[in-house]
Curated annotation (Swiss-Prot):
Residues 153-160 are lumenal. This is Phospholipase A and acyltransferase 3. The gene is Plaat3. It catalyses: a 1,2-diacyl-sn-glycero-3-phosphocholine + H2O = a 1-acyl-sn-glycero-3-phosphocholine + a fatty acid + H(+); a 1,2-diacyl-sn-glycero-3-phosphocholine + H2O = a 2-acyl-sn-glycero-3-phosphocholine + a fatty acid + H(+); 1,2-dihexadecanoyl-sn-glycero-3-phosphocholine + H2O = 1-hexadecanoyl-sn-glycero-3-phosphocholine + hexadecanoate + H(+); 1,2-dihexadecanoyl-sn-glycero-3-phosphocholine + H2O = 2-hexadecanoyl-sn-glycero-3-phosphocholine + hexadecanoate + H(+). Its EC number is 2.3.1.-, 3.1.1.32, 3.1.1.4. GO terms for biological process: ether lipid metabolic process; lens fiber cell differentiation; lipid catabolic process; membrane disassembly; N-acylphosphatidylethanolamine metabolic process; negative regulation of cell cycle; organelle disassembly; peroxisome organization.
């Protein structure tokens, strides 16, 4: 099935190994996105190193160059929850930011936060939220296992 042609203002999710990179489509094949120093076209797994930097550059590049060999899709997943800002405002703000160096934090100011703020006026990252949930569930599970282990150990000692 062919990938639907993105429209200006659409959020583009690019499937990198181990995470998704996000951009906003601005027309004529171009996207605007946050590019930490290692986020080069087709970077793949190497771009996970972007987690180690606190700065990013807002870049306007061809979608095909940013995606490289990775698959991508239009993903305006929050349209039911938030009303997108007017298209001219989305594009104008995105274009004004091109070339600027901005703060980059994996957990609070990443590429997904960036594009959601442009489209909806709300910076949010489901990848970060989901990772926190997994870490919390894992931590609670490990704590429960530890508690069970201590209780079984005490019970065994009491029987001896």
């Amino acid at each position: 099935m062919p990938i639907p042609e993105p429209k200006p203002g659409d959020l583009i999710e690019i499937f990198r190994p181990m995470y998704s990179h996000w951009a906003i489509y601005v027309g004529d094949g171009y996207v605007i996105h946050l590019a930490p120093p290692s986020e080069i076209p087709g970077a793949g797994a190497a771009s996970i190193m972007s987690a180690l930097t606190d700065k990013a550059i807002v870049k306007k590049e061809l979608l095909r160059d940013v995606a490289g060999k990775d698959k991508y899709q239009v993903n305006n997943k929050h349209d039911k929850e938030y009303t997108p800002l007017p298209l001219n405002k989305i594009i104008q703000r995105a274009e004004e930011l091109v070339g600027q160096e901005v703060l980059y934090r994996l957990t609070s100011e990443n590429c997904e936060h960036f594009v959601n703020e442009l489209r909806y006026g709300v910076p949010r990252s489901d990848q970060v939220r989901d990772a926190v949930k997994v870490a919390t569930v894992t931590g609670v599970g490990l704590a429960a296992l530890g508690l069970i282990g201590v209780m079984l150990s005490r019970n065994k000692k009491q029987k001896q």
